[in-house]
Amino acid sequence: MEKSTVYFTDFRCSVGTSQLDKLKKLCVAAGIKNIDMDGKFVAIKMHFGELGNLAFLRPNYAKAVADLCKEQGGMPFLTDCNTLYPGSRKNALDHLDCANLNGFNPISTGCQIIIGDGLRGTDEVEVPVVNGEYCKTALIGHAVMDADVFISLTHLKGHESTGFGGAIKNIGMGCGSRAGKMQQHASGKPAVREKLCRGCGRCAKECGSDAITYVNKKAVIDYDKCKGCGRCIGACSFDAIYNPNYNANELLDRKMAEYAQAVCYDRPCFHISLVQDISPNCDCHGENDAPILPDIGMFASFDPVALDQACADACLKAAPIANSQLGEHLSQPGWHCHHDHFKDSNPNIEWQATLDQAEKIGLGTRQYELKRI
């Protein structure tokens, strides 16, 4: 497969310009105007942030992309699907309230918001996964599949289960209905290392399913309630909660790539990733830890695999921030350094499996040419 082109611009701005101007220029250079949007519905998939989290992308970025779509005659809307776990985005009403509270509304974004899988997270379409190995079909939010054109607008950050959350995760996990998310997460559930558990209560507080209680000051997981989302793993500061299924995260990664294939296959797609506020964990948390790496820039491509690879490569070349989870890990005596910022931040991950599987099934290629704008 030939190399894909990924376009890049940094966040530096001279007087009289803005990051929004640079984002629009990046998208135009990357070819967004080559997509026929005239009279067509354009889904812009992004994460509105959990309440309390401040690392998500500002709504101004969404407006810049929506404005470009409208200039081309498109009818854009922002979309995301409901979460598997309880929280502020578990149904469409709460999800819309959360989006509004975090600044996303028709005025700030220039378009409407539609929750992709409906009121209860059950408005889904069963979509074939071309070349799928782990998922023959995917359960995708109906509104996502109703769109004529699909654009992903991604905040790249670390992730406690997948290593980092890039375009493929935004598409694959984000566009899955609640049942679709369950299918992806069903590879394994966490367990507790009692010797390491301090009984601090952070995991129980983070669990949206009320699946964690304490016996003799040690965490105990009720597997009848546990959804397998892995939020407790990221919440624990003592490595006391882990996934005993050694390949559970890898299976999650590969399923996620196949779900992204279902969303993108055989229709016009365009992908944008902003590498800033690189927190160690997902924006699904109700908080965000300090960034592990400095802000890097904005990337765009027609190929989500090449895009994720380019973003990952840029992150791996960056110097860690000392006062961060990554910096603290690397400063610990005896810490086993993986020379991989994502793995050194969250050791029990296999992020490259996502890109391997995505390339294998034809979603894109990991080989790319980077063009700076």
Model-derived features with residue positions:
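Terminal amphipathic helices with adjacent charged low-complexity linkers/tails
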Residues: 66-67
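Extended, low-polarity segments enriched in aliphatic/aromatic residues
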Residues: 2-61, 71-80, 85-373
